[in-house]
From Swiss-Prot:
It comes from Debaryomyces hansenii (strain ATCC 36239 / CBS 767 / BCRC 21394 / JCM 1990 / NBRC 0083 / IGC 2968) (Yeast). The keyword Cell division does not apply. Belongs to the RRT5 family. Keywords: Repeat, RNA-binding, Transcription, Transcription regulation. Residues 289-299 have a biased composition (Polar residues). The lineage of its organism: Eukaryota, Fungi, Dikarya, Ascomycota, Saccharomycotina. This is Regulator of rDNA transcription protein 5. CDD domains: RRM1_RRT5, RRM2_RRT5. Pfam families: RRM_1.
Length: 355
């Protein structure tokens, strides 16, 4: 005689006589700890601490059945959980891939000893879209193989990806801004919230998509740090779906890991400046380079003029020395000539005196 699991909000199943005091719990919140689950199940006197977050073992089969009856479909940490008796895995030797089919095309699901039957109660059928936690419709009685019901935990990788990342209290992320967006546009968009820092960048996914899909409009990502932390949620609520440069943008709190990644990249590529980091354009860089070249040219021209003056001065001194006697200055020579002329005029001619 098979052991019947008590009625649950979803369906009734029958185990094939294998008694188990362990229950399987699915759809727990990813942040649930062992301590929280133990407190949740405390009144049912679990025999051991629940290992992981999927199984809990109790002192008896009756107690485990009571847990299934009371807690299947209950809310725990704002999520509906699904509880059923644990069924140990027993390999049947069937091939992993492919299933044998009957002549009518229906799948042959194994021996009767390995089947579990849905309840035959049809007086109050469930709605057509109601399904159990394994995705099997419960409105029509049918047989299913135990192996078709997954009892293992969800892959660790999926759980790790769904774990919430730490979010910033003052920085907003925009992932779909128009490619031509510049610092001035972003500051104008957030002017009522006094943005203190703006980063505009293109992520790896955006670069990859724009290389492969030429018709797709190019986009950039934006990080905006606000002056006050309390303005974060208000800015997201009021500006979300508003247009920035003609495109509706979607805002959310930035991940701290993304902020750190962008800031480190900016430190490597940015030119030191006292002003907040902005996006440098090719025109600005060309203008700055042109100014530096002009300054260097002016300096060289002044040096050339100074050298030319020095050379001209030395050349002039050399010419004057070659023309003028070296021992008598020019002024003294002129004075001697003048005195000689005066002497000749003042002395009488000797021939005239004799006569």
């Amino acid at each position: 005689m098979s052991l019947v699991i008590p009625e649950s909000p979803m369906f009734e199943v029958a185990n094939n006589g294998k008694k188990s005091s362990r229950v399987y719990i699915k759809n727990l919140h990813f942040n649930t700890s062992e301590e929280e689950l133990e407190v949740f199940l405390k009144k049912y006197e679990p025999r051991h601490r629940p290992f992981g977050i999927a199984y809990a073992e109790f002192s008896s089969v009756e107690q485990a059945s009571k847990v299934v009856k009371d807690l299947n479909g209950a809310l725990f940490k704002d999520r509906q959980i699904f509880v059923k008796l644990h069924v140990p895995f027993s390999p049947t030797g069937k091939p992993i891939f492919g299933r044998r089919k009957t002549s009518s095309g229906a799948e042959k699901l194994g021996d009767a000893s390995n089947k579990v039957n849905l309840s035959a109660k049809t007086d109050k059928p469930l709605s057509s879209d109601t399904k159990d936690f394994d995705g099997v419709a419960s409105t029509v009685p049918r047989s299913i193989n135990i192996e078709d019901i997954p009892f293992t935990d969800e892959p660790k990788k999926v759980q790790d990806e769904d774990v919430q990342k730490k979010l910033s209290n003052d920085t907003i992320f925009i992932g779909n801004a128009v490619d031509k967006t510049v610092d001035k546009d972003v500051r104008e968009f957030f002017k009522d919230y006094y943005p203190t820092q703006v980063f505009i960048f293109r992520g790896a996914n955006q670069k990859r998509m724009q290389r492969t899909i030429s018709l797709r409009q190019k986009t950039v990502s934006v990080l905006v740090t606000l002056k006050k932390e309390e303005d974060l949620s208000k800015a997201i609520s009021e500006l979300n779906s508003k247009k920035l440069n003609g495109r509706a943008v979607y805002l959310k709190a930035a991940h701290l890991s993304k902020i750190e990644e962008v800031v480190n990249a900016a430190k490597i590529t940015a030119v030191p400046s006292k002003s907040p980091p902005t996006t440098a354009t090719a025109d600005d860089e060309a203008q700055e380079q042109k100014g530096n070249t002009t300054a260097e040219t002016s300096t060289l021209l002044e040096m050339f003029k100074d050298t030319q003056k020095k050379i001209q001065g030395k050349y002039k001194e050399t010419i004057e020395k070659q023309i003028r006697p070296s021992d008598t200055p020019l002024g003294e020579e002129e004075e001697e000539e003048e005195e000689g002329d005066e002497t000749k005029q003042g002395v009488p001619n000797e021939e005239m005196i004799v006569a």
